[in-house]
Regions:
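A short alpha/beta connector and helix-capping loop motif
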Residues: 136-162, 171-173
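C-terminal active-site subregion of NodB/CE4 polysaccharide deacetylases
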Residues: 26-126, 136-137, 212-351
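Bacterial signal peptide processing site
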Residues: 17-19
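Short loop/turn segments at strand-loop or loop-helix junctions that form parts
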Residues: 57-62, 126-130, 176, 203-205
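Acidic (Asp/Glu)-rich catalytic clusters
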Residues: 157-168, 182-202, 266, 284-293
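Positively charged n-region of N-terminal signal peptides that target proteins for export
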Residues: 1-4
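Alpha-helical scaffold elements lining the catalytic groove of polysaccharide deacetylases
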Residues: 145-156, 180-199, 205-233, 253-260
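C-terminal motif of bacterial Sec signal peptides marking the signal peptidase cleavage site
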Residues: 13-15
Length: 351
């Protein structure tokens, strides 16, 4: 009887080992999801074109007003449309989202790292002047974190971040010497922004017009802001400048070389991109027409569909926009565009 029991136990153990070897159960960590590779049909159905144009939107102030409370059209607070109501800004963001635009970081665009889902288009949001209504702080909470006015630009963006998680909300803020004009909070604001998915760039120390100054002044205007950023958020800002007034207006201007390669206080500051003021969408970073050192922006304002306002520009973009294939490491373009493609180490698909 004992022999029978021992034999049965041995058979049970061997059986368990045999089944375990041939019916191995993988834990969730061991299961690798395979991503479906897009086919030519997907590119055709979504009109994929990664040599299309990308809108870089230029904002300044966002004012806590309704559109009906201004003297100007479509939410403009001033006659030139550099200042917008918070109602207009919310409407702008809804428009971008509903028209299949998804935000990306400006620095990622410059570096050709456009990570947008299949069939969607990248859009870049920028703010100049470091105005208080870009990120108005109303106090400090019990955890020591800043409390942001929900009607300031960042307050609105944070609401949209929660409302539309796939919007990939981000923006780049270009500051002058006043930073965000809230001395008691400026350092906390800078750190909060870079820790919460936003970028900080250079808008010169005194909002200088580069057309009217010499090389020494040009270098100082650029260098002072980089020095300030090095002090407050070392290694966490972007070496991109938004040119005040769009000056010096021409890439061939003598001061451009000092803007892009400034020496100040014994330190060299290299700037990889300079942003202009107007007026249209910019080329794909994979296009031969792309010059990362002198980029166009779209003034975010309303002018009844004229003078390159938001409405006019986005109508033009209906035929020319960058449409993603959903793979950051692959460039997909129509055959008709292949002659515009730069030499690249990325995988390229032509359909």
């Amino acid at each position: 009887m004992k022999k029978i029991i021992i034999i049965l136990l041995l058979l049970f153990v061997v059986g368990c080992e045999f089944n375990g070897a041939n019916n191995e159960v993988k834990t969730p960590k061991e299961v690798i999801e395979t991503k479906k590779e897009n086919q030519e049909e997907d590119y055709i159905n979504n009109s994929v074109n990664e040599l299309g144009e990308v809108p870089i939107m230029m904002y300044h102030g966002i004012h806590n007003k309704k559109n009906s409370e201004t003297d100007y059209t479509g939410g403009n607070v001033d006659k030139d449309g550099y200042q917008r109501t918070v109602e207009a800004f919310r409407n702008d963001l809804e428009f971008y989202y509903n028209n299949n635009y998804r935000m990306i970081r400006l620095t990622d665009y410059v570096d050709g790292k456009i990570d947008v889902e299949l069939g969607k288009s990248p859009i870049i949001i920028t703010f100049d002047d470091g105005l208080q209504n870009s990120i108005k702080v109303t106090g400090i909470d019990e955890k020591g974190e800043i409390i942001i006015d929900p009607n300031s630009a960042v307050g609105v963006l944070e609401i949209f971040k929660k409302k539309y998680p796939d919007f990939n909300v981000t923006a780049t803020f270009f500051i002058n010497s006043g930073i965000f004009n809230q001395p008691e909070y400026n350092e906390k604001i800078l750190k909060w922004l870079v820790n919460n998915g936003y970028d900080i760039g250079n808008h010169t120390y005194s909002h200088v017009n580069f057309s009217n100054v010499d090389s020494t002044k040009s270098e100082a205007e650029v260098g002072k802001i980089y020095e300030l950023l090095d002090k407050n958020i070392p290694g966490k800002y972007v070496n991109i400048i938004a040119l005040p007034y769009g000056s010096p207006y021409s890439f061939e201007h003598d001061n451009m070389k000092y803007i892009l390669n400034a020496n100040y206080n014994g330190k060299n500051y290299k700037t990889k991109s300079a942003l202009r003021v107007g007026w249209k969408a910019e080329s794909s970073p994979f296009s031969k027409e792309f010059n990362p050192k002198f980029l166009k922006r779209i003034r975010a304002y309303d002018n009844n569909g004229e003078e390159f306002d938001i409405e006019m520009n986005f109508k033009l973009l209906e035929k020319t926009r960058y449409i993603s294939d959903g793979d950051v490491d692959t460039i997909v373009i129509p055959k008709s565009k292949k002659d515009l493609l730069i030499e690249t180490s990325k995988s390229v698909k032509v359909y």
